Curated annotation (Swiss-Prot):
It comes from Borreliella burgdorferi (strain ATCC 35210 / DSM 4680 / CIP 102532 / B31). The keyword DNA-binding does not apply. Gene3D superfamilies: 1.10.287.3240. This is V-type ATP synthase subunit D. GO terms for molecular function: ATP binding; proton-transporting ATP synthase activity, rotational mechanism; proton-transporting ATPase activity, rotational mechanism.
Length: 202
């Protein structure tokens, strides 16, 4: 931070900066609050989705155990692409899950167990939940990063920039006040000296 000059120009500069800091601080505080609320909301969504995943996997285990033969689902289900959208939250672009596109893999259903179709449907749900959880985690990471940056800025404004500007204004005001008082005193002394000089010359 540059050293302040005890001048009227610097006093105006400090007052302008203080005004700007006070105007900008509420915006930062609001952004911090919005980010916090959104993080809490997404973390709750993540917990709910995670519980859903656990229950589904338990149900799948129970369901698969009913059948003695194993089936190579990997060759039947292959993700082609995950379609995502983007949403702006308090200035942060976060990914939003949209859909999953699968490779078009064709097999002869005559030679597959009757329960495979149902199994594929369930596994697609499992895959989707996995993808959604990863995207929710990414959302939380992005928003947390911005929340930390915004919190640092709020602290900087509240604890450094605004107090420093106020202290500088006070310091300059005191100095200029002292200078003005000194000028008045010098003026009175000069006037008194002039009167004495005029009297002595008579």
């Amino acid at each position: 931070m540059s050293k302040i000059k005890l001048t009227k120009n610097d006093l105006k500069k400090q007052k302008d900066e203080l005004k700007m800091f006070k105007r900008y601080l509420p915006t930062l505080q609001l952004k911090k609050q919005q980010l916090y609320m959104e993080i809490v909301k997404i973390e709750n969504s993540y917990k709910i989705k995670n519980l859903e995943q656990q229950k589904l996997k338990e149900n799948i285990s129970n369901w698969i155990s009913l059948f003695s033969e194993k089936f190579p689902f990997e060759s039947w289900i292959q993700v082609k692409t995950v379609v995502k959208k983007s949403l702006n939250i308090a200035g942060v672009a976060i990914p939003i899950f949209d859909s999953i596109e699968y490779e078009d893999i064709r097999h002869d259903l005559l030679f597959t167990p009757y329960w495979v179709d149902k199994g594929i449907e369930i596994l697609k749900v499992v895959i989707q939940i996995d993808v959604e959880l990863k995207i929710l985690k990414k959302q939380i990471d992005l928003l947390l990063r911005e929340f930390r940056i915004t919190s640092q800025r709020v602290n900087l404004f509240e604890k450094v920039m605004i107090p420093t500007a106020k202290a500088n204004i006070k310091k300059i005001n005191i100095y200029l006040g002292d200078q003005q008082t000194a000028a008045v005193v010098r003026g009175k002394i000069a006037k008194s000296s002039l009167i004495k000089k005029n009297r002595n010359s008579l």
